[in-house]
């Protein structure tokens, strides 16, 4: 991200986003005070769900509708639209880590407000994160297998070239 003085924003725009996040977090903490705490065993699934949700929002085509008012997408990449708060939100929507913080807040709020719905959403998103991990591992495995196959074929190709010469 560029420094504030190199963007069409002001520090107040980022302060507004921080104040909103802080207010939502404080409201969540206040609402949670009389509720049963989320069990420690749910931290890993919530983390995986947060990863999947933030990746979905920031990177996937299916969520273009959500980014479109704030982010200009082209073949050259993405850049925030507009100026001031709109631009700042566009920057946020281009940052997986930033969206992850908001996603975590939303998922924990959902889990505290409606435990069954929250656990269901967390399970679906955590399974999606596991799928991403498996897909990445499979792609890496295929890439390495193909590289090994090519490396093994090179000496034979060299030997065949020598025999032909």
Language model segments and positions:
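Short amphipathic, positively biased membrane-proximal segments
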Residues: 1-165
């Amino acid at each position: 991200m560029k420094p504030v003085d190199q963007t069409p924003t002001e520090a107040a725009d980022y302060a507004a986003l921080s104040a909103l996040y802080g207010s939502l977090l404080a409201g969540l903490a206040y609402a949670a005070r009389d509720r049963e705490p989320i069990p420690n065993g749910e931290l890993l699934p919530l983390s995986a769900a947060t990863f999947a949700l933030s990746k979905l929002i920031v990177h996937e085509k299916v969520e273009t509708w959500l980014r479109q008012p704030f982010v200009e997408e082209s073949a050259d990449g993405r850049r925030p639209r507009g100026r001031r708060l709109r631009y700042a939100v566009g920057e946020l929507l281009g940052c997986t880590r930033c969206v992850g913080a908001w996603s975590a807040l939303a998922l924990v709020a959902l889990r505290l407000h409606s435990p069954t719905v929250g656990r269901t959403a967390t399970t679906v998103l955590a399974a999606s994160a596991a799928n991403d991990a498996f897909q990445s591992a499979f792609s890496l495995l295929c890439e390495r297998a193909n590289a090994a196959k090519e490396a093994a074929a090179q000496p034979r190709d060299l030997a065949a070239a020598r025999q032909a010469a």
